[in-house]
Amino acid sequence: MTDYKDTLNLPQTDFPMRANLPEREPQTLARWQTLDLYRKIRKDREGQPKFILHDGPPYANGRAHLGTAFNKTLKDIVVKSKTLSGFDAPFVPGWDCHGLPIELNVEKKLGKDKLSANAFRQACRDYAFSQIELQRDDFQRLGVLGDWQHPYLTMDFGYEADTVRALAKIVANGHLLRGQKPVHWCAACGSALAEAEVEYRDKASPAVDVGFEAVDAEAVRQRFGVKNATTRVLVPIWTTTPWTLPANEAVSVHPELHYALVKSELQNQPVYLILAKDLVDSAMLRYGVDDYEVHGNLKGDALEGMQLQHPFLDRIVPIILGEHVTTEAGTGNVHTAPAHGLEDYFVAEKYNLPINNPVDARGRFIPDTFLVGGQPVFKANEPIIVLLADSGHLLHSETIQHSYPHCWRHKTPLIFRATPQWFIGMNKNGLRERALAEIEKVTWLPAWGEARIGKLVADRPDWCISRQRLWGIPIPLFIHKKSGELHPKSPALMEKVAQLIEKESVDAWFDLDPKVLLGDDADHYEKVTDVLDVWFDSGVTHFCVLEKRRELKVPADIYLEGSDQHRGWFQSSLLTSLAIRDKAPYKSVLTYGFVVDSQGRKMSKSLGNVILPADVVKNLGADVLRLWAASMDYTVEVNVSDEILKRASDAYRRIRNTARFLLSNLYDFDPKKDKVAVDQLVALDRWAIFTTQKLQEKIITAYDRYRFPAIYQAIHNFCTVEMGSFYLDIIKDRLYTSKESGLPRRSAQTALYYIAEAFVRWIAPIISFTADEIWQFMPGDREPSVFLTQWFSDFPNAALSGEEEQRWQLLLQIRDEVNKALETYRNEGKIGSALTAEVVLYADERLNAVIATLGEELRFVLITSEASVLPFNEKSKAAFDTALPGLALEINVSEFEKCARCWQRRSSVGQIKEHADLCDRCVSNAFEDGEMRQFA
């Protein structure tokens, strides 16, 4: 038998079948660096409309984890897609460099006491730099394009100086407050914590009911209309923090709630209790009392001013009115310790009550505190409860599990503790109202983000921006020693400090002799040594980065971070921006869910479910990780596991194989001279171009709307359905067996060329390494990288009418039914390959009209040796119905010989003497002018 291999146009390409991403991707990275790709993109897009995605700075501590890898990948997808849309979309990465975790690491390594303050700060700076280098390598290895040589760092001298300038503007605009307010305090940190640094965890706490005895019981009884009685009156409070009782200054009741005077017997003694009417039954049940009488009924405002005896201190405390009192639990009477609770503080402020804070920075009672001096606060619960029981003031005690604030770093319970701090006042100059109004102008993705941040801003307290740490940006203020007022020239003085910091770092402030700035006034002023909350550092990036860097702009088009940043960066950025320039720093905000395992659990070493991005990159490649990121619905929790990553790897393989097929059939195609005009295209090729163009519109829209899973699904379906199992499958025969330069083959190659040009760009934002690798093998003259181009727009006008579209959709369904039937016959051993079969289609009028248009070329669409169509009502006994209404099939084994070249079984095989083992079509294609195709 003659070997006809040389007469075939078999696929050939140097584009490797095996991706080998872990080895190949670093080579692509090196090429990008040699090319200086990021700078080239910037130059290429100069003068185009700007699109700014502003990078929220990750913390400079530790290698990139899967959450940060997911974050940077999504951002990179957005930036690259906007670049392909023609925007100038620079990406300036940043890092958050101050704060406690870095201090703790340096402390552990070097010890704090062994170093001077300046040396300690330098050690923190060095440590942060080392962590930035690690993370920068991790992010670049993921294929993230950005200005990695010039990132913004919150510890850069210039950034630190600009942060001081941002604070100066906030001071000048009247938003800064000073006060001794209760703040979340971590004893392990020895510092206040921001709202965003607080985690809520379950904690076991004692829940106690404590009786405060009325000083003038008779007057109280008379208020309730009870006369001629001598029984004492108790006002029970319910609390889960008995340790705060030494700081009690009042008992709060709600002015509008109804309160009852309840007569009962407790501890074998008659007693009157004042309880919220709605809580009488639950309280008496708790006290184990069945027999009680309700005497009188008063609204809370009638109790205001009543005096009570503190249960164990020589202190008289008043009943005051508070709107925060509820009937959800307890007694309706709220223990009020202004030093240990915000609501307590605010209500006490109205009554000018003292802020009595007996707890030091280590979370211990100061030595002269009665009973519990020197003890840690939580250990003080027990002796206080024992004392209350011994004195008869303990009405009930139990242990409950409840959600309680913990330190995000130490995982230890926090306390509320009043300390002198600096605040951005939420209600000063209408900041809260303006923030809520501005939130409504921003586009929130998903939409529920608006309600979430709105509620957080509506409910949040003043923002405590001061910390008592060494490693941070100073709050460079001078306070008058007698009046406590800020120096009248504070903004101007802060500018002078900023200029010093710009040259010498934050040490310039800590080392500064006040006389240098204040002269003779220095003796009257105290220098503030607090540093700024790190959320302030990162919250002013809009001022220090977006406003200062020439290539950026404010407001940014989008901020993109995890949903926890509604409490953190989104909020701190919004508040500082409003306090500085009275508008939001962003036009839109996109949030995503936490990365969890396949069972929805957080990544944890103890659970053994931690997956490191470095390991994924090492084993599967960055493009597989990127494809996983794009495929996930980020609006909910994002699942990851080895199995999920394997699925991403399989999907990647399908995309790569599709690209390889396209490239391997374009090896001899020169788009300048081989492209076929649209009016000469084979109908199937025209359909493929039209389908590609139509899908591109959907994909670009999905990129614009940040619908990455929809893009992933569209590309995956394109590779597996429209292309893989339909178009590419059908045209193999034409590509391989038609005349090399004949119209049928060039028509198919023209379609493949357009598909490849579009396809490589679709995947570029997601699997960037692979897209740029494909780009190097594409035919024709082109830019050195796919990222120096835009979405493909050079499609011919291959538009189909609605009727033509519908016809091809029906053909897809018909072919699917034929394929299923052939597969069944193959599994049953009735046929070998599909080319051994002859198919008769029995079709109703609707389907017949579609099938008949293909004429003799129907067999090429079905990839069978013969195919014919007959009316549905002429079904033979051998025919069987399909799932498609109006279509039945009959499958027979062809009785003809197989063509040695195209493998189809045709009656013409053996009829041509010179080429007895070929069909007439192959003789024409190999040795004559070649066949013609009209439809397929």
From Swiss-Prot:
Places the protein is found: Cytoplasm
Q: Please tell me which stretches of this chain the record labels as motif 'HIGH' region.
A: 58-68
Q: Does the keyword ATP-binding apply?
A: yes
Main localization category: cytoplasm
The record ties this protein, via CDD domains, to: Anticodon_Ia_Ile_BEm, IleRS_core
Organism domain of life: Bacteria
Q: Where is this motif: 'KMSKS' region?
A: 602-606
GO BP annotation list: isoleucyl-tRNA aminoacylation
Keyword set for this entry?
Aminoacyl-tRNA synthetase, ATP-binding, Cytoplasm, Ligase, Metal-binding, Nucleotide-binding, Protein biosynthesis, Zinc
One Gene Ontology cellular component term attached to this UniProt record is: cytosol
Keyword Ligase in the entry? The reply is yes
Q: What is its EC number?
A: 6.1.1.5
* Residues annotated as binding Zn(2+): C899, C902, C919, C922
Swiss-Prot/TrEMBL catalytic activity = tRNA(Ile) + L-isoleucine + ATP = L-isoleucyl-tRNA(Ile) + AMP + diphosphate
Q: Where does ATP bind?
A: K605
A Gene Ontology MF term for this entry? zinc ion binding
What cofactor(s) does the depicted protein rely on?
Answer: Zn(2+)
Q: Which family does it belong to?
A: Belongs to the class-I aminoacyl-tRNA synthetase family. IleS type 1 subfamily.
Domain comment, in the record's words? IleRS has two distinct active sites: one for aminoacylation and one for editing. The misactivated valine is translocated from the active site to the editing site, which sterically excludes the correctly activated isoleucine. The single editing site contains two valyl binding pockets, one specific for each substrate (Val-AMP or Val-tRNA(Ile)).
Q: How does it assemble?
A: Monomer.
Protein function: Catalyzes the attachment of isoleucine to tRNA(Ile). As IleRS can inadvertently accommodate and process structurally similar amino acids such as valine, to avoid such errors it has two additional distinct tRNA(Ile)-dependent editing activities. One activity is designated as 'pretransfer' editing and involves the hydrolysis of activated Val-AMP. The other activity is designated 'posttransfer' editing and involves deacylation of mischarged Val-tRNA(Ile).
Q: Can you say what this protein is called? A: Isoleucine--tRNA ligase
Organism annotation: Coxiella burnetii (strain RSA 331 / Henzerling II)
Per the UniProt record, the lineage of the source organism begins with:
Bacteria, Pseudomonadati, Pseudomonadota, Gammaproteobacteria, Legionellales
In the UniProt record, the gene name given for this protein reads ileS
